[in-house]
Amino acid sequence: MARVTVQDAVEKIGNRFDLILTAARRARQLQLHTREPLVAEEGDKPTVIALREIEEGLINNQIMDQQEKFDAIVQEVAEKEAISFLADVQANS
């Protein structure tokens, strides 16, 4: 089990309040399994993993925003392809 010093994570994010928001957001992703951890889990809870990722500079709000934008684009493309496929199937029926 890794020890996390919050001060190191605060230095990466800027202030404690943003750290709390960022860590909570990342921990939620890990808890819901919408994202894989970027560090070894080592039996740690999602909140500790999130803090370790932040401390190592692997995660911040900008990175998570970019990931979510990418996911939204991928989902939109998949939905358009599905609609196109269904329209083709219906037209050929």
Swiss-Prot record:
One of its GO terms (biological process) is DNA-templated transcription. InterPro entries: DNA-dir_RNA_pol_omega, Pol_omega/Rpo6/RPB6, RPB6/omega-like_sf. It catalyses: RNA(n) + a ribonucleoside 5'-triphosphate = RNA(n+1) + diphosphate. One of its GO terms (cellular component) is DNA-directed RNA polymerase complex. Keywords: DNA-directed RNA polymerase, Nucleotidyltransferase, Transcription, Transferase. One of its GO terms (molecular function) is DNA binding. It is an enzyme of class 2 (transferase). Its EC number is 2.7.7.6. Coiled coil: none annotated. The RNAP catalytic core consists of 2 alpha, 1 beta, 1 beta' and 1 omega subunit. When a sigma factor is associated with the core the holoenzyme is formed, which can initiate transcription. PANTHER family: DNA-DIRECTED RNA POLYMERASE SUBUNIT OMEGA (PTHR34476:SF1). Belongs to the RNA polymerase subunit omega family. Promotes RNA polymerase assembly. Latches the N- and C-terminal regions of the beta' subunit thereby facilitating its interaction with the beta and alpha subunits. This is DNA-directed RNA polymerase subunit omega.
